[in-house]
Amino acid sequence: MPSGGNGTSNGVANANSTGNAGTSGNVPIYKPYRHLKTLEGHTAAISCVKFSNDGNLLASASVDKTMILWSATNYSLIHRYEGHSSGISDLAWSSDSHYTCSASDDCTLRIWDARSPYECLKVLRGHTNFVFCVNFNPPSNLIVSGSFDETIRIWEVKTGKCVRMIKAHSMPISSVHFNRDGSLIVSASHDGSCKIWDAKEGTCLKTLIDDKSPAVSFAKFSPNGKFILVATLDSTLKLSNYATGKFLKVYTGHTNKVFCITSAFSVTNGKYIVSGSEDNCVYLWDLQARNILQRLEGHTDAVISVSCHPVQNEISSSGNHLDKTIRIWKQDA
């Protein structure tokens, strides 16, 4: 089990620190997160960790070809899903928290029941290379996937059929995400571009970034759908206004030059940007002020994925090959 003191952050903010939120005016004092629990169960790098939308479950996916379902109340292992013949790069939850979908290097996606008997309900075949990223639309009748074959595919959940294939990028696709009403898809790619697509027509509506380098490693819509968080492999996170296409905020201080590390919006208590990092830490920034509020230490390898609990002030993070653990962090009451 990783050490790292007792998991408290002793970098930017510690137990006695308020970050730089201050105490004057109506700005709340920043309350630090502390290490709550370490989950062990995977035998290789954990590529993705995500809380269910109802907050009752946590799912993790790994290079070890399995996905694990955990209780998000006591963090016990509920079920281990097996079936992929290669490592899993990403997972997604349906809006009702009843189903998950996994994206694998075996060129398939699998839809799983998150309820007993935890069966594989569908295998989605069509990609011709590693499937790297996946997401459900809000009604959860469609799934979007991105692959090293440079295409985006949209799948019908009920039938498992591919209903649209978009030749989206000129290099592997690192991220795909629907907006809040399911009308738009944002995609990111190693070709240095980030694009917005009409989900129904499959047409490109806007290109947010079109640089040859650095690679765009992650992109997702904000909860209100007005902004897009974009990560690039020059250790930079940017917040873009979708309507204008302009970048409003830049977040730096973490290390991200190699892996497609996920980031997230934390909105349960204050508005934060949360990201993993290749220096084995989890970083939290104030969304508006852009300053680092806290660095969570404890993992023993790069932090590849982070997820924020939808209701509780909790964060989950997952580690690369040398770590192989999930750490749960809880904010002081």
From Swiss-Prot:
Q: How does it assemble?
A: Unlike WDR5A, does not interact with RBL or TRO.
Q: Where are the WD repeats?
A: 1-40, 41-80, 83-122, 126-167, 169-207, 211-252, 253-295, 298-333
Return the InterPro entries for the record. Answer: G-protein_beta_WD-40_rep (IPR020472), WD40/YVTN_repeat-like_dom_sf (IPR015943), WD40_repeat_CS (IPR019775), WD40_repeat_dom_sf (IPR036322), WD40_rpt (IPR001680), WD_LIS1/nudF_dynein_reg (IPR050349)
The keyword Repeat is assigned to this record: yes
Keyword annotations of the record: Repeat, WD repeat
CDD domains, per database record: WD40
Q: What happens when the gene is disrupted?
A: No visible phenotype.
Question: Which GO terms of the cellular component aspect does the record hold?
Answer: Cul4-RING E3 ubiquitin ligase complex
Q: Which organism is it from?
A: Arabidopsis thaliana
What PANTHER family has UniProt attached to this entry? WD REPEAT-CONTAINING PROTEIN POP1
Name under which the protein is recorded: COMPASS-like H3K4 histone methylase component WDR5B
